[in-house]
Amino acid sequence: MPLTVKCPTCQTEVTWDETSKFKPFCSDRCKLIDLGDWAAEKNAIPVKPEFDPEMLDQLGYDEADFFMDDGSMDDKKQ
């Protein structure tokens, strides 16, 4: 018995085998709709932020500190 899955876009049953040209989608149209949703950022993979902006505030960092040119990189540019 072949494995069947539902198309992520329209929920149509799709047979999962070598003959399924657009798996897991039922058609090229559904595949492109899904791609468009990802491109428009309607879908997203949740990730944990690398740092908490509030933590930077607690440590005393100010946004202006990140963009200051104090000349410390001048020696490394040469």
UniProtKB/Swiss-Prot annotation:
UniProt KW Zinc keyword? yes
Which Pfam families does the UniProt record give? Answer: YacG (PF03884)
A single Gene Ontology MF term assigned here is: DNA topoisomerase type II (double strand cut, ATP-hydrolyzing) inhibitor activity
For this entry, list what GO says about its biological process. Answer: regulation of DNA-templated transcription
Q: Quote the record's cofactor note.
A: Binds 1 zinc ion.
Q: Which InterPro entries did the record assign?
A: DNA_gyrase_inhibitor_YacG, Znf_NHR/GATA
Q: Which keywords has UniProt assigned to this entry?
A: Metal-binding, Zinc
Give the protein's cofactors.
Zn(2+)
> Which annotated residues bind Zn(2+)?
7, 10, 26, 30
The parts of the chain that form a coiled coil are: none
What does the annotation say about its assembly with partners? Answer: Interacts with GyrB.
Q: Which family does it belong to?
A: Belongs to the DNA gyrase inhibitor YacG family.
Q: Which NCBIfam families match?
A: PRK00418.1
Q: What does this protein do?
A: Inhibits all the catalytic activities of DNA gyrase by preventing its interaction with DNA. Acts by binding directly to the C-terminal domain of GyrB, which probably disrupts DNA binding by the gyrase.
Listed name of the protein = DNA gyrase inhibitor YacG
The gene name reads yacG
